[in-house]
A protein has these predicted regions:
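Hydrophobic structural patches
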Residues: 11, 39-42, 132
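N-terminal helix-turn-helix DNA-binding core of bacterial DNA-binding proteins
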Residues: 20-64
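Charged, amphipathic alpha-helical coiled-coil/dimerization segments
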Residues: 70-130
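N-terminal positioning helix adjacent to the helix-turn-helix/winged-helix DNA-binding module
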Residues: 14, 34-35, 50, 97, ...
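N-terminal leader segment of winged-helix/HTH proteins
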Residues: 1-29, 75-77
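C-terminal regulatory/oligomerization modules of transcriptional regulators
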Residues: 1, 122-152
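Alpha-helical linker/hinge and terminal dimerization helices associated
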Residues: 11-21, 58, 101-117, 135-146
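Short, hydrophobic-biased segments on the C-terminal half of alpha helices
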Residues: 51, 69-70
Length: 152
């Protein structure tokens, strides 16, 4: 693989850019980027809203998810309810207080997306989307082949 391909796949540059873009949002609301990502995830995944769902979809370890949701509940960004079928499962829902944060987060992502793909033709963008989807499927397949020891 070429160096720039490795860099892109490792995500370092994109993570750094995202961190810089989100820094003012984090400071404004006194939240960490991971806290905001959890709120945004829950806004967009109202049916997949347990700690296990958050852990699996955001690739955050179980203990850290527990700490995050505890703090977000304490700060009135989340509410928690026991599952109807199984009371052991806690379901998290964002509160009204969260909407400004998730709206700003979406605006930042939209701007970032526009800037990242600036100057790229529609045809090249479609090719890129196909390649990214294939890579994503390959990664998912590889992850399913190996036991998860990092998030246990």
């Amino acid at each position: 693989m070429k160096e720039n391909e490795i860099g892109l796949l490792r995500g370092g540059q994109i993570k750094y850019l995202l961190s810089r873009q989100m820094n003012s949002l984090c400071k404004k609301y006194h939240l960490r980027l991971t806290d905001i990502e959890v709120l945004f995830y829950l806004k967009n995944n109202t049916e997949k809203n347990t700690a296990s769902d958050i852990q699996k979809n955001l690739h955050i370890n179980k203990g850290y998810v527990s700490q995050i949701v505890k703090n977000l509940i304490k700060e009135d960004y989340l509410t928690v309810t026991a599952g109807e079928k199984d009371h052991r499962y806690m379901h998290y829902t964002i509160t009204e207080k969260t909407h400004d944060i998730t709206d700003e987060h979406q605006r930042i992502w939209d701007l970032l997306g526009r800037k990242l793909f600036e100057g790229i033709s529609t045809e090249d963008r479609e090719t890129f989307d196909k390649v990214v989807n294939t890579i994503y499927e390959n990664i998912t397949e590889m992850l399913n082949e190996q036991p998860d020891t990092a998030h246990a």
